[in-house]
Amino acid sequence: VHAAVAAAAVMAGGRPLWETTDTEWDVLFEIGVRGVLNLARTAVPALLRGAQPRSGRFVALASAAAHRGLWHLAAYNAAKHAVVGLVRGLATDLRGTGVTATAVSPGSTSTAMLAATAALYDLPDVDEFAGYQLLDRLLRPEEVAATVCWLCGESSSAITGTVVHADGGFTA
């Protein structure tokens, strides 16, 4: 095993934090955070034993929402912030092993999950999210995937314990 990518996510909420249900909170953290933890528990030992010692890659998808509060999505913000913290802690634990751990924080990307988010806000069109990004368009999934692939490759060997913002300028 050379690389492991944690990319599972779910959208829940769409209401103020004080109205967020325990179920919504639990779903966000179970899938978005515990999923990363479970992959790390399984994949990191294999990365440490990998075919190319001292060169494994662990990448987790966070979100631009980890770095900027979003209206009525505080629980989602918190879950994605937890992913960033988990990756930073993992990178520290991997110090000196040659295995890196990084997070990618995409902005609004043209996916089914963004469509679900639009539905939470009763928006008729996901393109309304494009205005939050300096590129003034939605990201394409393949743009985010290219960032992840780069982080899984040798040319990113000096990148660990940090976040790569593939967010179209959302967090600028």
Pin down the residues of each PLM region.
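Substrate-binding pocket helix/loop in short-chain dehydrogenase/reductase
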Residues: 15-17, 24-29, 129
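Short, small/polar-rich loop/turn modules that mediate ligand/substrate recognition or access, typified
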Residues: 55, 95, 100, 159-161
